[in-house]
Amino acid sequence: MSKKIGILTSGGDCAGLNTVIRAVTLRAVNKYNWQVYGIKDGTLGLMTNPLNIVELKPKDFDGHLMRMGGTFLGSNNKGNPFNSDISDQIIDGFKKTKLDALIGIGGDGSMKILQALTKKGGINFVGIPKTIDNDVKENELSIGYDTAVDTATNALDMLQPTAASHRRAMILEVMGRDAGHIALNAGIAGGADVILIPEIPYSLKSISRHIDRKSVV
């Protein structure tokens, strides 16, 4: 039996989103003969009148699109979907689409939102973890994390010549919020002298002493 599934991206953008959308579309259409619909701008696409959705075909994904960062469907992290009025609009919009299931690509916040909508509105929901923070539980690697670590490592590599030339201590701050995965792994790969992550308490005095010892050497 043919199925209709929807796919959306929610929250911040990252590398790899268009590739995931392509993989879902190719598998669903070519193997199962299902219809795939992209929902524009995250859950906002289910709140507009008319609904902001578009059918996706394998031919839509050319080489140029695959080289683009971000998500061609658009995304958003505005508003509060836990608000009853907003969640009701999203659920009503989903029902109007007559989709059999919804695939949501998002981070920990997006997963919580879509899970709540599932419980409230009976939406068949499949989550694909996407976050450079790599902080989605029960998941080893999230979409976007590897590229974030690689980018931060390259930044460290570029900082080191300037730091050495001017005898300066350089600080590179990376994203991650309450998760130190990017800082830890980029710091190791880039040869950082000190790595600070939110999971482990640290003392500024001990860090200062360590830097002083390094500067003497």
State where each predicted segment sits.
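Accessory alpha-helical/coil subdomains and C-terminal extensions
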Residues: V36, G93, A101-G106, K112-A116, ...
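Short, ordered loop/turn segments at secondary-structure junctions
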Residues: S10-D13, I39-G45, N77-K78, G107-S110, ...
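A glycine- and small-aliphatic-rich helix-loop capping segment at beta-alpha/alpha-beta transitions
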Residues: R22-N30, N52-K59, A116-V126, I143-T147, ...
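Short glycine/serine/threonine-rich phosphate/pyrophosphate-binding segments
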Residues: D13-V24, L46-M47, F82-D88, L102-Q115, ...
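Glycine-rich oxoanion-binding loops at beta->alpha junctions
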Residues: L46-G104, G109-S110, I143-N154
